[in-house]
C-alpha cells in the first residue's frame, strides 16, 4: 500500500501486527473448538502473545512465516501451546485470517459508501 494514498484506519488493518493478530485469533478459535485442550490449556492459549520482531527473528531460522509464528505463539502458551496449529495447515490459518482482515476493512469503508449518491 502506498502510505500517502491510504487512510490510516485502513492501513492499520494491513500491518504485520494486524495480520499476525488475525492469525492468532484463528489459532485460538480452532483450539476452542477442539476436544483435546484442557480448560487450563485454553486459558494459556488465549493468553499467548507474540511480537512481530520475535516472529521475524524466528523466521530467519524456519524460513516460513507461519512456522515461525506458531513457534513463538506456542512457546508463549507453555505446555498448552502444543495444541496451537494442531490439525491445521498454513493455508487454513492464512485464508481465514485474510477473510477477517477483509471484513474489518469493509466495516471501515462501508459507512463512507452510504454517503455516495446512487447511480
Identify what each model region corresponds to:
Residues 1-119:
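A helix-coil-helix interface module used to build multimeric assemblies
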Amino acid at each position: 500500500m502506498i502510505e500517502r494514498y491510504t487512510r490510516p484506519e485502513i492501513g492499520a488493518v494491513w500491518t504485520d501486527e494486524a495480520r499476525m493478530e488475525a492469525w492468532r485469533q484463528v489459532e485460538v478459535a480452532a483450539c476452542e473448538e477442539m476436544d483435546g485442550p484442557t480448560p487450563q490449556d485454553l486459558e494459556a492459549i488465549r493468553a499467548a502473545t507474540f511480537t512481530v520482531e520475535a516472529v521475524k527473528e524466528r523466521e530467519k531460522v524456519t524460513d516460513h512465516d507461519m512456522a515461525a509464528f506458531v513457534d513463538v505463539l506456542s512457546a508463549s502458551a507453555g505446555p498448552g501451546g502444543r495444541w496451537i496449529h494442531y490439525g491445521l495447515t498454513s493455508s487454513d490459518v492464512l485464508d481465514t485470517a485474510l477473510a477477517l482482515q477483509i471484513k474489518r476493512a469493509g466495516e471501515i469503508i462501508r459507512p463512507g459508501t452510504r454517503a455516495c449518491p446512487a447511480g
